[in-house]
Amino acid sequence: MLTIWRVRLTFRFCRGLILSVMQNRTETIGRDVSARRRTTRRGEETRRQLIQAAVECLCERGYAATSIEAVMERAGVSRGSVLHQFPTRTALIAGAIEAAMEIMMAHTRERMRDLPDAEARYRAMCDVFWETQKIPEGAAVTEALLASRWDEALAEAMRPVAMRVEAEIDDDMRATALAAGVKDVEACAVHARVLILTLRGITLELMYDKGRAMIHRALDQVRAQHVVHCEEMLGPAKNPS
């Protein structure tokens, strides 16, 4: 009888000890998870600030002047915070360009959504692309593309990002052309890419003098060629009733 009582007492003690340990462990895990979430949120905010600062530096000061020191000063963070998110300057620039490209795509998609239908979107493609090229992120991307001509590490870091973004752009243009009723969808995807490349070049030509008349005439010619392309693919534009 005494032995049974001792067994029961030992069992109750062990069960209480196990429950206490489990409760403490659960509370510790909960605190750890909350701390990790706070750390993650802070890290994400720091990363966002750094990317925004890098894009602004690229746009306003150029690639050569976009150093880690310049970015950390503009973002208002410590050098350690920068290096924790981006261990090298190349990683910082590549991260900023990836974000800039995504912002440019979002800008284009938002402008396209404002238009009434797929045909209107396709016909407006040249003007929408031109607007997108002129936003600060467009200038930052152009600056990095020029720098990648001689910076092999930057070119290597940007290559997979550019390939992914370009594939998304091509898919968007194919979907727009298909929805508009175009038969030769691939020709439209190529046309869209030609527009982007041409308009990016025009932004370069206008960087040091926005009033160059001949360059603006060239831009008008690009727009006129796009109208001809749309008439070939979609027929004449319908007059608004």
What are these regions (language model features)?
Residues 105-110, 131-142, 152-179, 190, ...:
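Amphipathic alpha-helical packing segments from all-alpha helical-bundle domains
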